[in-house]
């Protein structure tokens, strides 16, 4: 079945629900005491995992659209990417405010230098910031070919973000490894899609 614009509208509504309902759940859990004895860590990990899930969903769009021959799916990619950035920003804020505290926010630079996993995290967020700021059609027209080069940096985030997660957890858990494997598979899939173009270019 060929997807129509109406289907894409419903998909975008589903994305909005999938991205906002977890935030509602988190707020309710905070207010109803549904978190652990270390709620700050719970919030940091929850927001970080949401950002990573949305990153993986964003990366999945292109190969899914190509293999299913549904080019309209690409219209969902920007929305997923913006929600990935939004949750990534919540993740950064949760660390800055809940872990360091507003009175010690100046220590953030020191923490970034002395904790390499934080360095990877802030690099990932800065790339997502650049991608979010240039996600409009206007920016795409103004930047021309440079726009695609910039947005290819999402694959750098796909490498750094799972490493950041693996490095940051203090207890043994399968989830960081699962996310890392999923990111690696998506990167491999993207490589296979780009390889024919590269060979054609070399010829």
Curated annotation (Swiss-Prot):
Record note on cofactor: Binds 1 FMN per subunit. Binds 1 heme b (iron(II)-protoporphyrin IX) group per subunit.
Gene Ontology biological-process entries: protein repair
Main location: membrane
Entry membrane topology: Multi-pass membrane protein
Domain of life the protein comes from: Bacteria
Cofactor: FMN; heme b
Keywords: Cell inner membrane, Cell membrane, Electron transport, Flavoprotein, FMN, Heme, Iron, Membrane, Metal-binding, Transmembrane, Transmembrane helix, Transport
GO CC terms of this entry: plasma membrane
Residue intervals passing through the bilayer: 13-33, 79-99, 116-136, 147-167, 169-189
Record has Heme as a keyword: yes
Keyword Transmembrane helix: yes
Single GO molecular function: metal ion binding
Compartment(s) where it occurs, according to its Swiss-Prot or TrEMBL record: Cell inner membrane
InterPro entries cross-referenced by the UniProt entry: Fe3_Rdtase_TM_dom (IPR013130), MsrQ-like (IPR022837)
Family: Belongs to the MsrQ family.
HAMAP family: MsrQ
UniProt function note: Part of the MsrPQ system that repairs oxidized periplasmic proteins containing methionine sulfoxide residues (Met-O), using respiratory chain electrons. Thus protects these proteins from oxidative-stress damage caused by reactive species of oxygen and chlorine generated by the host defense mechanisms. MsrPQ is essential for the maintenance of envelope integrity under bleach stress, rescuing a wide series of structurally unrelated periplasmic proteins from methionine oxidation.
Self-association and partners: Heterodimer of a catalytic subunit (MsrP) and a heme-binding subunit (MsrQ).
Name by which UniProt lists this protein: Protein-methionine-sulfoxide reductase heme-binding subunit MsrQ
């Amino acid at each position: 079945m060929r997807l129509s614009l109406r289907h894409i509208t419903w998909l975008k509504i589903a994305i909005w629900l999938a991205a906002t309902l977890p935030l509602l759940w988190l707020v309710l859990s905070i207010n109803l005491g549904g978190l652990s004895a270390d709620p700050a860590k719970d919030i940091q990990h929850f927001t970080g995992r949401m950002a990573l899930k949305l990153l993986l969903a964003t990366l999945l769009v292109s190969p899914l659209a190509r293999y299913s021959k549904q080019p309209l799916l690409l219209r969902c990619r920007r929305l997923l990417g913006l929600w990935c950035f939004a949750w990534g920003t919540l993740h950064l804020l949760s660390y800055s405010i809940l872990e360091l505290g507003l009175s010690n926010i100046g220590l953030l630079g020191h923490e970034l230098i002395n904790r390499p996993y934080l360095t990877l995290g802030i690099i990932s967020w800065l790339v997502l910031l650049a991608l979010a700021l240039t996600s409009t059609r206007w920016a795409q027209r103004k930047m021309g070919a440079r726009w695609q080069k910039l947005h290819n940096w999402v694959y750098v985030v796909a490498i750094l973000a799972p490493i950041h997660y693996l490095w940051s957890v203090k207890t043994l858990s399968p989830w960081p490894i699962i996310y890392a494997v999923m990111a690696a598979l998506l990167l491999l899939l993207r490589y296979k899609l780009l390889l024919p173009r590269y060979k054609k270019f070399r010829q």
